Amino acid sequence: MKENRKIIHIDMDAFYASIEQRDNPKYKGKPLIVGGDPNRRGVVATCSYEARKYGIHSAMPSLTAYKLCPKAIFIRPRMEVYKKVSRQVMNILNEYSNLVEHLSLDEAFVDVSKSKRCKGSATLMALEIKERIFKEVGLTASAGVSFNKFLAKMASDFRKPDGITVITEENSKDFIRNIPIGKFFGVGRVTKNKLNNIGVFKGEDLLKFSEEELIDIFSDRGKILYEFARGIDNRPVNPYRIRKSIGKEITLREDIEDIDEMIEILERIAERVSESLCLLNKKGKTVTLKVKFNDFKHITRSITLEHFLKEQKEIMECVKDLISIVDFKNKKVRLLGITISSLEENIITEEREQLSFDV
């Protein structure tokens, strides 16, 4: 399985925002933010590259984004449209291999090791896929090509937007040595800080530690760090990857109608959901709020972000955005719930932490 593998990672560029700019020419070239209203409890789902120049990023409170760029255009997500476009992209990928692992609406791994397309060249296939996505869907994508999933994912992030990077066995060591440790796939803020504390700032710094030393410091995560630093990742591309969700809900002892009281309860639910994500080594892109009224009718509201999350802070930013668009119609609430879906395995498990709530 490890010999002669050819893995492509396709990552759509600013997917939601790019679709909106494609469908609405008036948005092209302008700072566009897909997410919540800055005048209410809103959160940025994603934004155009024009908006990113101002320091705006996914999961940022919409009000903060507005302060950074008052001229930004804010629009609500159109999830059904994004799902339809995603299917178009994935259908293209499926023509190149039956081993396509969908990570989310906007990214996937493709194992083309046995594909005869483009004379068997993974690089040419990646270029052709990018060209077809642009011609048939009207969007750009970035591609990473390598001999395993870790390096293919790292490569696709290297030249965004609309780039392609190829990492071979010959150049992989140099590539990894120069990558900031915070850019390593699966290394979050907590692990990054812990690595910095032992003098690890780039991939090359990890090479100074033996496998035993890293395991001693990071437990099972140490073995993964040791292997990633050496370009080792034997995980197969899994087309049957099971989509799951993690959620918690609370039936209230007394029906309530005060929004601030609901937020306080949702904070506790979000904390429990975050703990479950950490324990199960998961993170997700889609946050769903469930509200059941005292007449036993219920509604759900969802938002899908561009990046994966697991921390209570980020979950609550989304929940506050979602509850702001719920029409309570003067009805009291008897149940509240939060679910995280579109899950991705957290390759390197983050240690549990006390959140500092800094953005």
Swiss-Prot record:
Q: What is the gene name?
A: dinB
Quote the cofactor binding remark: Binds 2 magnesium ions per subunit.
Residues of the UmuC domain: 7-188
In Swiss-Prot or TrEMBL terms, this protein is called: DNA polymerase IV
Q: Kindly report, in one word, the top-level EC class recorded for this enzyme.
A: transferase
The record places the active site at 107
Named from the GO MF annotations, one term is: magnesium ion binding
SUPFAM superfamilies, A to Z: DNA/RNA polymerases, Lesion bypass DNA polymerase (Y-family), little finger domain
Q: Name the job this protein performs.
A: Poorly processive, error-prone DNA polymerase involved in untargeted mutagenesis. Copies undamaged DNA at stalled replication forks, which arise in vivo from mismatched or misaligned primer ends. These misaligned primers can be extended by PolIV. Exhibits no 3'-5' exonuclease (proofreading) activity. May be involved in translesional synthesis, in conjunction with the beta clamp from PolIII.
Binding positions (Mg(2+)) = 11, 106
- Annotated EC: 2.7.7.7
Annotated keywords: Cytoplasm, DNA damage, DNA repair, DNA replication, DNA-binding, DNA-directed DNA polymerase, Magnesium, Metal-binding, Mutator protein, Nucleotidyltransferase, Transferase
**What main location does UniProt list?**
cytoplasm
